[in-house]
């Protein structure tokens, strides 16, 4: 399956990197690359591996060794990455 990152998910990664970079630029790059690597490595061949999402019609990939969760939606042969959230964040009712 193809991975398609939404503009919102890309913005989430950009903001996350900037936030972490205030304290540790090297760690910021590493965290963002870790998230991207896990999504791109795991979901194309195992799109159902994420848990059922809090928002109907979505699934969630928990990124190992981080507090981040990536909600996504399956549409035909595409895994649409919707957002990148901190697990402690209050989630919206729709994505």
State the predicted function of each range.
Residues 68-69, 73-95:
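Enriched for short, Lys/Arg-rich terminal
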Residues 62-65:
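A short catalytic or substrate-binding loop motif that flags glycine-/basic-rich loops and adjacent residues
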Residues 2-59, 94:
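Basic, Lys/Arg-enriched alpha-helical interface segments
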């Amino acid at each position: 399956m193809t991975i398609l990152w939404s503009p919102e998910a890309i913005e989430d990664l950009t903001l996350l990197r900037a936030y972490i970079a205030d304290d540790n630029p090297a760690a910021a790059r590493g965290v963002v690359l870790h998230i991207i690597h896990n999504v791109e490595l795991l979901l194309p061949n195992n799109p159902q591996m994420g848990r059922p999402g809090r928002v109907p019609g979505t699934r969630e990939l928990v990124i190992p060794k981080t507090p981040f969760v990536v909600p996504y939606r399956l549409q035909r042969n595409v895994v649409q990455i919707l957002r990148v959230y901190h697990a402690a964040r209050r989630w919206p009712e729709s994505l």
